[in-house]
């Protein structure tokens, strides 16, 4: 689709592409660029990862935002991985136009229910069933406060997942098992306008979908 534009919100800076989640994001960006889509990339900078000039080769715009890792993000009713990425600067940039938005993971979906984005095409890439992942972390953790955090985050993510499903137009799943899971969730929620679920294998140097 020549001359098309797309906002892509990444939970992390997708270069270097050195772990599964960012590999999927980076090679997806390359594939979109090669398809003639102008990607407006939004990504969150934290830990040791730094802005990467190479991303400008494949994106029309690249925006970086800090995560809010303070106690209010932990105590929020939203999951910490979501609330810490609820950047007002990000929302301001999303509201500059009316083009579709691709949210990478639940992490990036802080504003999916915002009424000002109600008429936008919203696509959510599910990298896994996030609340189950945190439940498994809780089971493996021995430190008391970490166990509490993982247990709370798992419950928050399960509730937040319902909100995301009810506001997304398209859900991209990464595996047949995840596809079956989200199809079952849709049956239980019985939404008036359910999102379309599309299985899209992880992107790599050979690309996905």
Regions found by a protein language model. Name each.
Residues 41-93:
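A conserved catalytic-core segment of Leloir-type glycosyltransferases
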Residues 116-120, 162-202:
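Helix-loop-beta element that forms the nucleotide-linked donor phosphate-binding surface
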Residues 47-53, 110-112, 179-182:
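Short, charged/polar "capping" segments at the starts of alpha-helices
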């Amino acid at each position: 689709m020549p001359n098309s534009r797309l906002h892509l919100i990444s939970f992390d800076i997708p270069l270097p592409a050195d772990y599964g989640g960012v590999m999927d994001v980076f090679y997806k960006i390359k594939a979109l660029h090669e398809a003639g889509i102008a990607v407006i990339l939004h990504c969150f900078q934290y830990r040791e990862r730094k802005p990467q000039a190479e991303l400008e080769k494949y994106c029309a715009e690249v925006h970086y935002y800090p995560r809010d890792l303070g106690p209010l993000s932990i105590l929020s009713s939203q999951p910490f991985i979501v609330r810490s990425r609820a950047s007002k600067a990000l929302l301001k940039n999303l509201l500059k136009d009316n083009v579709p938005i691709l949210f990478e993971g639940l992490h990036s979906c802080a504003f999916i229910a915002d009424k000002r984005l109600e008429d936008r095409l919203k696509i959510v890439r599910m990298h896994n069933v996030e609340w189950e992942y945190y439940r498994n972390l809780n089971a493996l953790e021995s430190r008391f406060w970490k166990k509490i955090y993982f247990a709370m985050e798992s419950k928050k993510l399960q509730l937040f997942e319902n909100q995301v499903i009810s506001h997304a137009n398209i859900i991209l799943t990464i595996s047949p098992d995840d596809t079956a899971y989200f199809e079952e969730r849709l049956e239980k929620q019985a939404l008036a306008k359910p999102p379309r679920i599309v299985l899209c294998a992880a992107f790599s140097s050979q690309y996905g979908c």
